[in-house]
Amino acid sequence: MSGRTGERPFGDIVTSIRYWIIHTITVPMLFLAGWLFVSTGLAYDVFGTPRPNEYFDQARQGLPLVTDRYEGKQQIDEFTKGL
């Protein structure tokens, strides 16, 4: 047997003017904030990922692939030695 939770029905919320006034402002602002977060480079700094021009330096232009399962630790140490 189902009962009422006392919450407003979703249909009432979506059709209210207050809902649309609030969301026509907040949803575009969320997209704008996300775009600024990525375009300014702050996302790279916060999450510690390298920028697109920092993946490869002049000394190493190839991909650092681990090719041997049992010597993987040694290969990773060789890759990170120059960093």
From Swiss-Prot:
<keyword id="KW-0472">Membrane</keyword>
<comment type="subunit">
    <text>Heterodimer of an alpha subunit and a beta subunit. PSII is composed of 1 copy each of membrane proteins PsbA, PsbB, PsbC, PsbD, PsbE, PsbF, PsbH, PsbI, PsbJ, PsbK, PsbL, PsbM, PsbT, PsbX, PsbY, PsbZ, Psb30/Ycf12, peripheral proteins PsbO, CyanoQ (PsbQ), PsbU, PsbV and a large number of cofactors. It forms dimeric complexes.</text>
</comment>
<dbReference type="Pfam" id="PF00283">
    <property type="entry name" value="Cytochrom_B559"/>
</dbReference>
<keyword id="KW-0812">Transmembrane</keyword>
<comment type="similarity">
    <text>Belongs to the PsbE/PsbF family.</text>
</comment>
<keyword id="KW-0602">Photosynthesis</keyword>
<keyword id="KW-0408">Iron</keyword>
<dbReference type="InterPro" id="IPR006217">
    <property type="entry name" value="PSII_cyt_b559_asu"/>
</dbReference>
<dbReference type="GO" id="GO:0031676">
    <property type="term" value="C:plasma membrane-derived thylakoid membrane"/>
</dbReference>
<feature type="transmembrane region" description="Helical">
    <location>
        <begin position="21"/>
        <end position="35"/>
    </location>
</feature>
<dbReference type="InterPro" id="IPR037025">
    <property type="entry name" value="PSII_cyt_b559_asu_sf"/>
</dbReference>
<comment type="function">
    <text>This b-type cytochrome is tightly associated with the reaction center of photosystem II (PSII). PSII is a light-driven water:plastoquinone oxidoreductase that uses light energy to abstract electrons from H(2)O, generating O(2) and a proton gradient subsequently used for ATP formation. It consists of a core antenna complex that captures photons, and an electron transfer chain that converts photonic excitation into a charge separation.</text>
</comment>
<keyword id="KW-0604">Photosystem II</keyword>
<dbReference type="GO" id="GO:0009539">
    <property type="term" value="C:photosystem II reaction center"/>
</dbReference>
<dbReference type="InterPro" id="IPR013082">
    <property type="entry name" value="PSII_cytb559_asu_lum"/>
</dbReference>
<dbReference type="InterPro" id="IPR006216">
    <property type="entry name" value="PSII_cyt_b559_CS"/>
</dbReference>
<dbReference type="GO" id="GO:0009767">
    <property type="term" value="P:photosynthetic electron transport chain"/>
</dbReference>
<keyword id="KW-0249">Electron transport</keyword>
<feature type="binding site" description="axial binding residue">
    <location>
        <position position="23"/>
    </location>
    <ligand>
        <name>heme</name>
    </ligand>
</feature>
<dbReference type="Pfam" id="PF00284">
    <property type="entry name" value="Cytochrom_B559a"/>
</dbReference>
<dbReference type="GO" id="GO:0005506">
    <property type="term" value="F:iron ion binding"/>
</dbReference>
<dbReference type="GO" id="GO:0009055">
    <property type="term" value="F:electron transfer activity"/>
</dbReference>
<keyword id="KW-0349">Heme</keyword>
<keyword id="KW-0479">Metal-binding</keyword>
<dbReference type="InterPro" id="IPR013081">
    <property type="entry name" value="PSII_cyt_b559_N"/>
</dbReference>
<keyword id="KW-0813">Transport</keyword>
<keyword id="KW-1133">Transmembrane helix</keyword>
<keyword id="KW-0793">Thylakoid</keyword>
<dbReference type="GO" id="GO:0020037">
    <property type="term" value="F:heme binding"/>
</dbReference>
<protein>
    <recommendedName>
        <fullName>Cytochrome b559 subunit alpha</fullName>
    </recommendedName>
</protein>
